Amino acid sequence: MIQVIEFPDREFETKADLFKALVEHKKELVSLKKSVTKNADAVAYGYIENISKNNVDKAIASADLPDSLNVKVVINTTNFLDSHGDLHINGIWNKSVSDNKTFLHLQEHNRDFGHVITDNAKGSVEVMTWKQLGLSYEGTTEALIFESTIDKLRNGFMLKQYANGWVKNHSVGMRYVNLELAINSEAEYDKEYKERWDKYYPIVANKELADERGYMWIVSEAKIVEGSAVVMGSNSATPTLENKQEPLDNTLDNEAEQSLQTEQQKEKLKELLNKF
């Protein structure tokens, strides 16, 4: 028997029965998907190599944590079939990134004050190879990137997670804008959906999941609600790219003062030498 997320209370004997139900209820399914905010789930968690440019060899004690930390993280990637059955395609985030100067960076999609990492994350879209993201797939993806400064006073717990390199997955909280159904079916009544499948199947990185499912939702535009650090996400190709500490203002002041003192000592030494 076949069970799918679109019909949680139904079972299907064959894929043909499933595909028929998807087509018959497509309008309702699209409306339902558009009516809710999509978040991570724990179904598609996979191993991702730790590719952060600032990996740590051992855990950092709480007393040694910096007061702030800059991180660069991947919130979502296109051309990757996630456990919701969605294939986000290139261009999906362009309008939302253009329309918003900053975004919410949250802890596990919890929208309360205690779980805000920052409300000032800067979003961008970068073309990256899968190998840059720690995966062996060929080709490229458009990565939704957040660059955030984490303040220890605001969320010390997540600062510690990032500082130690423990955050390996992220997830986008989003609202669907445009999506279409694609089905790998040779039935005549599925012709429209098969054409869409044939068009987008070549760009799917994880084709093994597409082959297993036999259908997918092609999402061409979505609105970013927030981006979250998660333990397990529906798209596992979402690592932390960088985590680095910025010098504190008082550190810079101390360095400047030490430099001045050194120069003064040099001048005094010159004066003493000139006396002889």
Where do the PLM segments sit?
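Terminal short linear interaction segments
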Residues: 251-276
